[in-house]
Structures are given as structure tokens and as C-alpha cells.
Amino acid sequence: MTSWPPRIVIRRSSGLRTMESALVRSGLGPVAGVDEAGRGACAGPLVVAACVLAPKPYPALARLDDSKKLTERTREELFPAITRLAVAWSVVSFPADEVDRMGVHVANIEGMRRAVAGLTTTPGYVLTDGFRVPGLPAPSLPVIGGDAAAACIAAASVLAKVSRDRVMVAMDETHPGYGFAIHKGYNTPAHLAALEVLGPCPEHRRSWSNVAALLHRVDNSSGSAR
């Protein structure tokens, strides 16, 4: 019995475009890639992006790779090139309180659905970065390390990362002292030290253990003082 999609599709390839090309040759295009940014942060939004690239070389995207391997400058330079050259792209965001209400995994999966639904081109196949996503409008495949294995996922990774980083830089102006523009809401020593001094702001995720523990200590201290 022949597996479907073809086995070549699910192997991690040496070239970023091999996965998309194999799917398109099998009649399953256009192919959308989906990825997120901010899943592990204790502050700021969860941002999810979807992107469809045509199965052809893009000289302007020659540096495209897993966004975590790229410098901030390179990501910023790639962002307008991706939005200009992509067949379709979409970015959705969940603020901290919504991540708390839904749970980060549920928000991530729902974000992937919404990002794909927001594409102006309906994909024939969807590649997600590591997560199985039920309820998509097309067949899909989770790819471990997908942002390093498929160009459309790498492009979505850059879109999500740059979009979120820009929000965090603006948030640094609204909530000074935490260093959001530097650490982007992740649990760095500097961020944790600022949290101890300033306490959580409205952009911190109350469901995160370190934020919840700090709030618990503050509540106990307030209770003891009364």
C-alpha cells in the first residue's frame, strides 16, 4: 500500500524547498507553511503566521532559514521581501490574557487555524512546525524542525517573529523598566530581576508559573500587612 503523502515529503531534506516541490509535483499545491513566535515567553502575545510561496527560486529570500538562526537585522530585511513575494500570507495574534484564558497550546493550535483561514489563497496542503493541527481546510503534516526544513515554514517563522518583536519593542515604551525591547518577554535573568522589583504588568501571562508565584507572594505579603 502506497503511503500518502509520498515518503519523500515527510523526510527532512537538505534543501529548504524540497518538501514544497514534492507536494506540488504530487498535485497538492499550493503549500502553506505555519509557525508561531512567543510560545515560551512569560509576557506579550503569541503570534502565529502562515505563508504560501511559489515553488521557484527567490534570490531575495536566499538567506531564508529558521528565524532563530537569523540575526534581527536579517529577519527585518527578509520581512518586506516575504510579504512582497509571497503568494499569500497571514499573521494573527493572541494577547497575554487570551493566552491565559485558552492555554498556550490551545491558543497555538487555534492560531494556526486562523492564520491558514486568513490566507487569500486556499492551500492544497499545509505544513506545520511540529504540531498536528486538526480542523484545517486542507490536508496537513507536522514537521519537526519545520522552519529549517521547508521554505514556507521558515517564511512564516520570520513573519511571526518580526511581527511579535515589533509589538514587544512598542510595549517597552508603554511598560518601561522590564526591558521588553531586549528580551522580548522571555525568561532571561534581567527580565526575572525586573519582575521581582516591579511586579507583573498587564502584559505578563498570569498562568506562567514564575508570574503566578510572584503574584502569590505579593498577595501573601499584602495579607500579612493587613
Swiss-Prot record:
This is Ribonuclease HII. The gene is rnhB. One of its GO terms (cellular component) is ribonuclease H2 complex. Its cofactor is Mn(2+); Mg(2+). GO terms for molecular function: manganese ion binding; RNA binding; RNA-DNA hybrid ribonuclease activity. HAMAP family: RNase_HII_B. Coiled coil: none annotated. PANTHER family: RIBONUCLEASE H2 SUBUNIT A (PTHR10954), RIBONUCLEASE HII (PTHR10954:SF18). Residues 29-220 form the RNase H type-2 domain. InterPro entries: RNase_HII, RNase_HII/HIII, RNase_HII/HIII_dom, RNaseH-like_sf, RNaseH_sf. Its EC number is 3.1.26.4. Belongs to the RNase HII family. Manganese or magnesium. Binds 1 divalent metal ion per monomer in the absence of substrate. May bind a second metal ion after substrate binding. GO terms for biological process: DNA replication, removal of RNA primer; mismatch repair. Pfam families: RNase_HII. A divalent metal cation binds at residues 35-36, 129. The keyword Membrane does not apply. Endonuclease that specifically degrades the RNA of RNA-DNA hybrids. It catalyses: Endonucleolytic cleavage to 5'-phosphomonoester. It is found in: Cytoplasm. It comes from Rhodococcus opacus (strain B4). Keywords: Cytoplasm, Endonuclease, Hydrolase, Manganese, Metal-binding, Nuclease.
